[in-house]
Amino acid sequence: MDPQDCACATGASCTCAGSCKCKNCKCTSCKKSCCSCCPAGCAKCAKSCVCKEPLSDKCSCCT
């Protein structure tokens, strides 16, 4: 199971899995996996992540 916080430097690559739900992920290589889902118009995710489907009314990185 992935940790809630990635332990890698800002902009660095890391080994986060595709299912990673790190809340404060700063890795350029895994920003796409910061959120497992997000509601439409989720501003917090839009700034730091490319959220994966399916969409939901709750977001793993905004709670």
UniProtKB/Swiss-Prot annotation:
Residues binding a divalent metal cation 7, per UniProt: 51, 59, 61-62
GO aspect biological process, one term: cellular response to copper ion
Superkingdom of origin: Eukaryota
Amino-acid positions noted as binding a divalent metal cation 2 in the UniProt annotation, renumbered to this chain: 8, 14, 16, 27
Region called Beta, residue ranges: 1-30
Residue numbers binding a divalent metal cation 6: 38, 42, 45, 62
Keywords noted in UniProt: Metal-binding, Metal-thiolate cluster
Residue positions binding a divalent metal cation 1: 6, 8, 22, 25
Matching InterPro entries: Metalthion_dom_sf, Metalthion_dom_sf_vert, Metalthion_vert, Metalthion_vert_metal_BS
GO cellular component, one term: nucleus
Residues annotated to bind a divalent metal cation 5: 35, 37-38, 51
Binding site residues for a divalent metal cation 3: 16, 20, 25, 30
UniProt: a divalent metal cation 4 binding residues: 34-35, 45, 49
Region called Alpha, residue ranges: 31-63
Family designation: Belongs to the metallothionein superfamily. Type 1 family.
Family annotation (PANTHER family): METALLOTHIONEIN (PTHR23299), METALLOTHIONEIN-1X (PTHR23299:SF24)
Protein name per Swiss-Prot or TrEMBL: Metallothionein
